[in-house]
Amino acid sequence: TSAKQWGWLSVFPQALYSTRGQKGVEKGEIEQMTVGVAVNHNYVTKEITAMNGVNVMGRSYTTDYENRYDVEGAEASKWGYQFSQQFDYALEVSPPVLFVTGWNEWHAWRQPTPWGGANSQVNNALVDQFSDEFSRDLEPTKGALQDHYYYLFVNYARKYKGASPIPTPGENVTIDMTAGTDQWKTVEPYYAAYIGNTFDRD
């Protein structure tokens, strides 16, 4: 890879990309960078590996607590530590384009022959998806991760793209339910719901 192309996944601190290549990066002309939920990368050998390998940079991995999943277990997968570390850095750099990995990649791609870097090969490798911890999808699931990553992503997207401040409630008002709607005009914040969009949730 080179700094003159766009990336789709990177270890923290993520690679920076510019149409002017490394010279553009050095001048701070950053065009694009990536944010990943997890990376199929071995943090000991510093090589690409399968998600069912060892020392993989899963959802709970951070550079200051590499083996969090081994110590804390499945609960650690729910908090998006690696995603947050990468997104916080992306917000600091603030490039015009962010590529977030991933969405709708739920497939178990098994490689029967050894796969990975020279010192990180895995037999019967599940390259991109293996378990809740060792996978990188953001979309909601009925499993243990539920909608945690979706809402974490929404939170960071609002920070990156900008959003109106959350309205603050106005003063308490006593409403006479028989006195008409004009008395609601001073109630803040104003909330308008789409008509007919409430459906049963599973």
In which residue ranges do the predicted regions lie?
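Surface-exposed, glycine/proline- and aromatic-rich loop segments on solvent-exposed faces
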Residues: Y194-D202
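Glycan-processing catalytic domains of CAZymes
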Residues: T1-D176, G180, E188-Y191
